[in-house]
Amino acid sequence: MKAHYWFILFLWVAVRMEAGGKMAVSPSATEMLLRFQSHDVELASSWVKQREDLNTAFLKSLEPDRLLHNFRVNAGLPSVAKPLEGWESPGVGLRGHFVGHYLSAVSALVERYEDAGLARNLEKVVEGMYACQQAHGNGYLSAFPETDIEVLETRFTGVWAPYYTLHKIMQGLLDVYLRTGNEKAYALSLIHI
């Protein structure tokens, strides 16, 4: 509860009311927020740190080839990896969106902790996605067929949410670029549909 009071105090100091009821952020608060980096924060032993450790262990357990399976199959490339299950199962309309979340989460961990193992896995996934985009030959990149977009726009049935999935993939790639400086991830985020 004490942390909530500090947060409220911070907001009270950082935001002030100007004449006419407009909100304005003080320059010093803005500068402080702009200087804020994820590695400047250390989580104390708590349920939050336990959850971060649990999620980090899960992300480390994921093999890049399994994450790339549906992308490769969709691009006509061979894959001998065991497909992921659940939302990423082959044939599921949202396949690919979890990989976007993976990219966002792992890039945040790499930025924060400079974990070499996670950085290598992230690089492998980006390189694998690049190979898939090249195999498509038209700039397209996803774990579902490009025709799903046409089906959605013309028949309105039979597909789930291709634009949502593309957004997750693009956001993940942008996060990789912004957090790690990976130029290839940025180029990949410019998906052509």
What are these regions (language model features)?
Residues 148-160:
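Aromatic/His-enriched, Gly/Pro-containing loop or helix-boundary segments
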Residues 39, 90-104, 117-120, 160-168, ...:
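Aromatic- and histidine-enriched alpha-helix N-cap/loop-to-helix transition segments
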Residues 20-98, 119-146:
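Low-complexity, Ser/Thr/Pro/Gly-enriched N-terminal "stalk/linker" regions
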Residues 136, 140, 164, 177-184:
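Mature catalytic domains of secreted/periplasmic carbohydrate-active enzymes
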Residues 10-18:
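Hydrophobic h-region of N-terminal signal peptides that target proteins for export
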Residues 2-9:
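Sec-dependent signal peptide recognition
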Residues 191-193:
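Conserved small/polar residues in nucleotide/adenosyl-binding loops
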Residues 40, 46-50, 102-116, 168-182:
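Well-ordered alpha-helical scaffold segments within catalytic/enzyme domains
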